[in-house]
């Protein structure tokens, strides 16, 4: 029998007993420091689904693994931040007591057990309706344990294809915690099989989950659209400040390639350097602007020097979403070896995109329809695809417009919000 849905005075939907629905998200994607630096608060505050949940607690259980010491002490009690009336962000720490700093493992366990106990009490006190994990590994295990202890359903969102990551790098996703990929595979199957709902960020990520134990009739896709800053949905021609943003970063409108993402091996940013070298060899004097941080910066700079393009490479680090939205329409092309949400932002900005056929990129980029898609790892083909945009401005403009149209259809945030709400309604109805 269909369940009637009530709306509480606070704006969130109500349970059968009249209480507003509340959500707990356990996710390690971003720390509060990274959220503030990049201006991506929308990626957290969207989790209430436009008031479907009256309050959302977003918890990063091991935030101080990656935060700077200037931001917060690495050990101690969890830190709480109020984003607005509906959202609380909690950062767990990698140790509980400063005096045990040298005993990392026991101190880590004390911190995590303390956080688990706090979350257990939070679920009971606030009558949280559902738990959502950000991955099928550590946060998936924590979410499963809390769900079992409290009797509420849990959802796993899958934001990557871990099998392909291992194939590309030979490394496990979380080497410090699980050591080997074989251990991670067992954990993933355990979590996927027990999840009440598995949601891939795209079809490729969902296919990975289905191949590793997720149940078909408890699986769906929650795309990136409602996680994206609304400034990226503004028509490119209506975005002010692009020329000024270019000037501040040392590039000229229409005279630079753009890479958005982490400078890490799995993302293959070094291939963008090779693309730049190829274009210089053809006489195209462009620069390459890299927006993101990571361990490969020095290696990429050295490669640029070897190829004679080092002086035309700009490493700008992470930038605010407002600046990013200004920059995208100004570039000659976006080069996307392997990106996630950044590919959505690039397409919404109407940029011509040259991409590898990896992960979900082929779902959005179709060769000569919405951009150029080439075999994964084929840097010469990626360079030729990019060169086509640089040499044929009219073609580049057509591909950029087509990419934006496809992204607007695929990533409509209102449509995606409603899809997520409908899946949560079904899930919560089954749990009663």
Named regions from a protein language model:
Residues 1-81:
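N-terminal subdomain of nucleotide-sugar transferases
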Residues 24, 251-267, 273-276:
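Conserved donor-binding/catalytic core segment of Leloir-type glycosyltransferases
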Residues 44-48, 120-121, 141, 145-149, ...:
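Membrane-proximal helix-turn-helix segments that form the acceptor-binding/catalytic region
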Residues 178-240, 251, 315:
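Donor nucleotide-sugar binding/catalytic pocket of nucleotide-sugar-dependent glycosyltransferases
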Residues 192, 318-319, 325-331, 346:
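Short alpha-helical donor nucleotide-sugar binding micro-motif in glycosyltransferases
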Residues 298-319:
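Nucleotide-activated donor-binding/catalytic signature segment of Leloir-type glycosyltransferases, i.e.
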Residues 328-339, 351-352:
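Acidic donor-binding loop of glycosyltransferase active sites
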Residues 367-368, 372-379, 388-394:
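Conserved acidic donor-binding segment of nucleotide-sugar-dependent glycosyltransferases
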């Amino acid at each position: 029998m269909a369940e009637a849905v009530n709306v509480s005075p606070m704006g969130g939907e109500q349970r059968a007993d009249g209480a507003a629905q509340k959500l707990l998200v356990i996710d390690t994607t971003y720390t509060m420091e990274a959220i503030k630096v990049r201006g991506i608060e929308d990626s957290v505050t969207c989790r209430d689904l436009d008031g479907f949940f009256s309050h959302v607690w977003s918890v990063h259980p091991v935030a101080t693994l990656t935060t700077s010491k200037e931001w917060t002490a690495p050990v101690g009690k969890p830190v709480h931040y109020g984003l607005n009336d509906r959202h609380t962000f909690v950062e767990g720490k990698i140790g509980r007591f400063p005096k045990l700093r040298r005993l990392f493992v026991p101190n880590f366990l004390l911190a995590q057990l303390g956080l688990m106990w706090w979350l257990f009490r939070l679920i009971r006190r606030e009558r949280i309706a559902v738990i959502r994990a950000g991955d099928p590994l550590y946060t998936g295990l924590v979410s499963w344990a809390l769900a079992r202890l409290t009797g509420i359903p849990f959802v796993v969102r899958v934001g990557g294809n871990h099998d392909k990551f291992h194939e590309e790098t030979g490394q496990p996703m979380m080497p410090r915690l699980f050591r080997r990929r074989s251990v991670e595979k067992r954990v993933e199957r355990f979590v996927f099989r027990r999840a009440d709902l598995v949601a891939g960020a795209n079809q490729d990520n969902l296919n990975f989950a289905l191949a590793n134990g997720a149940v078909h009739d408890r699986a769906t896709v929650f795309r990136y659209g409602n996680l994206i800053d609304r400034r990226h949905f503004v028509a490119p021609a209506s975005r002010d400040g692009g020329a000024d943003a270019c000037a501040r970063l040392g590039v000229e409108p229409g005279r630079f390639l753009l890479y958005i993402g982490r400078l890490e091996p799995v993302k293959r940013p070094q291939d963008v350097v090779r693309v730049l070298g190829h274009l210089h060899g053809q006489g195209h004097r462009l620069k390459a602007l890299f927006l993101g941080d990571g361990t490969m910066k020095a290696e990429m700079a050295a490669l640029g020097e070897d190829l004679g393009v080092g002086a035309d490479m700009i490493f700008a680090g992470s930038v605010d979403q407002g600046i990013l939205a200004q920059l995208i329409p100004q570039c000659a092309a976006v080069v996307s070896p392997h990106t996630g949400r950044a590919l959505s932002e690039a397409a919404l900005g109407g940029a011509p995109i040259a991409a590898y056929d990896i992960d979900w990129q082929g779902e959005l980029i179709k060769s000569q329809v919405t951009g150029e898609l080439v075999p994964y790892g084929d840097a010469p083909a990626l360079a030729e695809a990019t060169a086509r945009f640089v040499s044929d401005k009219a073609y580049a403009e057509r591909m950029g417009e087509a990419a934006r149209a496809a992204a607007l259809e695929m990533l409509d945030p209102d449509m995606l919000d409603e899809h997520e709400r409908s899946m949560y309604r079904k899930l919560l109805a089954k749990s009663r």
